[in-house]
């Protein structure tokens, strides 16, 4: 359960899932710091930044922004995740926040279960935990019971702009 008096860092990409979580957090009156990492891997990634920056400004929210321009040639997804999570933790410490909010949803959970089964991964649970810790910082995932389509619908109903990352449409 989230503490309504606490400050949280919320990871936002500009997609429907994170924009829905951001809007919901703002609607609930939570004190949030919007954290965005721009990897510059897509031609239009700066448009994601502009969207998130505009939302943060229009709602009087603080924005923590990291630009990443160099990578090693290894697994980009794993590297991006490490960069992102470390930045979120740094932001938690900078603002003395209580934890990190991420918009992982039911589709992500199903995908993770399928990957765990395909890899025969032994884990204490299947899917994604609603609460985990990264470098001692709590990571909350309040949208795990909601499908991405429903988060997009919420954005449409609430008039919250979002962007579709074309790389998420590719088969992995």
Predicted regions and their residues:
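Core alpha/beta nucleotide-donor-binding catalytic domains of modification enzymes
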Residues: 1-172
